[in-house]
Each structure stands twice: as C-alpha cells, then as structure tokens.
A protein has these predicted regions:
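Hydrophobic beta-strand-centered segment that forms part of the acyl-chain substrate-binding groove
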Residues: 47-81
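Catalytic strand-loop segment that frames the active site of acyl-thioester-processing enzymes
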Residues: 1-35
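A short mixed-secondary-structure module that forms the rim of ligand-binding clefts
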Residues: 37-39
Length: 82
C-alpha cells in the first residue's frame, strides 16, 4: 500500500436520486424513495474512491462492515451527498 492515507480522510459524492435507485424488492415496495441498497452502493463507491490512490497495482481491498443510518427520506430527483 502506498503511503499517505490518514485517519479522518474524506471524500464526497453528490448526485441526484434516479428511479433505478428505488427499492424493488419483488414488487413489495412501491415508494419513490432512495433505497438502502443504493445507499450502501454509494457508500462502497466513495470508500473505494478514497482508497484507490493508495493501492498498488497488485493490491485489492475488501470491506469488513457497513453501518447505514437513514437521516431522512430522499425522493427521486433529490440531491444526495455521501
């Protein structure tokens, strides 16, 4: 691993919620809100973007845990920051 990664490092991703980010759950959920699985996807995406500059070409990263907390609903076309 390349040097430089420090505790507390941050990166942000801002995007608009799209319809593909809604819950699908075999038709059981119909609300037009940002889904938990999409939130985890975006959390994993920003985590990888933060780590990528420090990985050597032969290295890979594996997550150990994800803690998700919805602070408020976000509808389709809402701006979200992860």
């Amino acid at each position: 691993m390349r040097p430089g990664l420090r505790r507390g490092a941050r990166i942000e991703l801002t995007f608009l919620v799209e319809s593909w980010m809604k819950p699908h759950l075999e038709g059981l959920v119909k609300h037009p809100l940002y889904a938990t699985w999409a939130m985890v996807y975006h959390m994993e995406t920003v985590s990888r973007a933060l780590l990528a500059p420090y990985l050597e070409s032969h290295e890979e990263a594996v997550g150990g845990a994800v803690l998700v907390k919805h602070l408020g609903p976000a509808g389709v076309r809402a701006r979200v920051r992860v």
